[in-house]
Design a protein with these regions (language model features):
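Flexible glycan-contacting loops in extracellular carbohydrate-active proteins
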Residues: 183-210
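Carbohydrate-binding surfaces in secreted/extracellular proteins
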Residues: 32, 97, 158-191
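Extracellular beta-strand elements of beta-rich domains used
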Residues: 32, 210-214
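Secretory/extracellular carbohydrate-interaction modules
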Residues: 73-136
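Extracellular glycan-recognition surfaces and repeat-rich motifs
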Residues: 38-74
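N-terminal secretory signal peptides that target proteins for export/translocation
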Residues: 1-10
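Extracellular carbohydrate-recognition regions
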Residues: 23-48, 224-225, 229-238
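Short, aromatic/His-centered strand-loop micro-motif at the edge of beta-sheets
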Residues: 137-159
Length: 244
């Protein structure tokens, strides 16, 4: 379904079509294409102060694609943590994103970040090649979930889906080049914890992030983007169509 936009100055051979797709439940989306190279991403906020060399860079693997290189020194207590700044009041949500591990170390993302060093962590374990869930609070760590041994190859793009629902969390992942829908994949990690009831999504440690989408329903991922660098623009706002 579509509607012709009103009040525009139309060229006789062109008009705008605005698709009537609802994105009311999309809390946040960013593919970093509007950010300046070598600067922090403008749509993100610092959720935890620390050493900060974060910046948007050219994708080392996919030409002409911009990605977020998060602070390289965030290891337990040194570097900054960046958050989306749009999900602080969010209790339940889904997140889809692409992530590249530049080196073999402990790194990943935070969710239900409630401020400072109070958050849940999903990270890649250097010594086990697993994904783990951790709670960080008052400078202490508590593990509450560990996956089987996974590939988790460095310098390679992976696609993730995180489900945050009540006290229960699950993670699905795949090679970013694979077209298999997340709906057809089984979780690689599941865990439960009841400490933090709401909070934001963000980075942890040195990772490259791209095509980050936070939404309240899986249906909202139908077309915020195709999660792919070759088609990472939103097609739901408008298109220009030539009329012969």
């Amino acid at each position: 379904m579509y509607a012709v936009s009103k009040g525009a100055n139309f060229h006789p051979h062109y008009f705008f079509i605005t698709f009537a797709t609802s994105q009311a439940e999309i809390l946040f989306k960013d593919n970093f294409e509007g950010d300046a190279i070598d600067n922090p991403p403008k749509n993100w906020a610092v959720g935890l102060e620390g050493l900060d060399d974060s910046k948007v860079i050219w994708d080392p693997d996919r030409p002409k694609n911009r990605v977020f290189s998060s602070p390289t020194e965030r290891h337990d207590a040194k570097g900054a943590v960046y958050i989306t700044g749009k999900g602080k009041g969010g209790t339940d949500y889904y997140v889809q994103w692409e992530m590249l591990y530049p080196k073999d170390f402990y790194m990943g993302i935070v969710f239900r970040h409630t401020g400072g060093e109070a958050f849940y962590l999903l990270d890649r374990r250097q010594n086990t090649k697993k994904l783990d869930f951790w709670k960080r609070q008052k400078a202490k760590w508590e593990n509450f979930g560990s996956s089987a041994v996974l590939d988790l190859e460095i310098e390679k793009w992976w696609s993730f889906q995180l489900k945050v629902s009540g006290n229960d969390f699950e993670v699905k992942m795949k090679d970013s080049e694979k077209k298999t829908p997340f709906a057809k994949l089984k979780p690689v990690l599941e865990g439960s914890h009841n400490e933090f009831k709401k909070g934001d999504f963000g980075n942890y440690g040195w990772v490259l992030l791209d095509n980050v989408v936070v939404a309240t329903e899986l249906a909202d991922f139908s077309n915020p983007w195709v999660i792919s660098p070759v088609n990472s623009l939103s097609t739901s706002w408008a298109v220009i169509k030539r009329v012969d």
